C-alpha cells in the first residue's frame, strides 16, 4: 500500500517546493494562521499539508505551534541559498510528473510519453521555450552542485590558466 500511494508524499513535497514554502520558512518560521495568510493556503487543507511535511521530516512544528525547516531542508530547499538543489524537484513537478501518469500507456505501446512522443526531439522542445529551458538548466546545475563543489576543492587548479565547464548547464563549476 505504501508504495502504491507514494505519490501522495511526492506531490506534497513538490507542491511545497513550487510554493517556495521552505524559502519563506527560512526567512520567517511561523504558526499556521500566519502561514495561511503569507502563503495563500486555504484553511481546509493547510494544517494537514504542513503536518504531512512534518511527518515526512521536511518541517518541524514546535510546542508553540511554530513551523520551521529542518536543518537539511533549510540547507537544500531554501531557494535563497547557494546549496539549493530544488531545481530538479521543480522540473520533476512541472515536466516529469505528468509523464509518469502515462506509464501504463508507455508500457503497452512502447511509445515515449515525454516530448519525444511522435519522434520529436525532446531537447528541441525544451530549448524552444525560454521558461522551460531556464527550469531545465537550474535543475541540472542544482543536481550537479555537490560534485562541482568537491571538484573545485580537490582539483589541482594551480597549473591551469583556463578551463571549460561543459557538463553543468550554467557553468556551476
Kindly give the residue locations of the regions a language model identified:
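Conserved SAM/SAH-binding loop
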Residues: 169-170
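Conserved Class I S-adenosyl-L-methionine-dependent methyltransferase catalytic core
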Residues: 1-162
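Conserved beta-strand/loop positions that form the S-adenosyl-L-methionine
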Residues: 166
Amino acid at each position: 500500500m505504501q508504495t502504491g500511494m507514494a505519490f501522495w508524499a511526492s506531490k506534497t513535497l513538490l507542491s511545497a517546493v513550487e510554493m517556495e514554502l521552505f524559502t519563506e520558512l527560512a526567512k520567517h518560521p511561523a504558526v499556521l494562521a500566519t502561514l495561511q495568510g503569507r502563503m495563500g493556503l486555504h484553511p481546509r487543507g493547510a494544517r494537514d499539508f504542513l503536518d504531512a511535511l512534518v511527518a515526512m521530516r521536511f518541517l518541524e512544528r514546535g510546542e508553540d505551534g511554530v513551523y520551521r525547516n529542518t536543518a537539511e531542508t533549510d540547507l537544500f530547499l531554501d531557494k535563497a541559498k547557494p546549496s539549493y538543489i530544488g531545481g530538479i524537484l521543480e522540473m520533476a513537478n512541472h515536466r516529469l510528473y505528468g509523464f509518469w501518469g502515462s506509464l501504463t500507456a508507455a508500457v503497452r505501446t512502447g511509445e515515449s510519453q515525454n516530448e519525444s512522443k511522435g519522434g520529436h526531439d525532446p531537447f528541441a522542445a525544451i530549448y524552444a521555450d525560454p521558461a522551460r529551458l531556464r527550469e531545465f538548466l537550474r535543475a541540472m546545475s542544482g543536481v550537479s552542485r555537490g560534485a562541482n563543489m568537491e571538484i573545485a576543492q580537490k582539483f589541482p587548479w594551480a597549473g591551469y590558466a583556463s578551463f571549460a565547464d561543459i557538463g553543468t548547464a550554467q557553468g556551476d563549476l
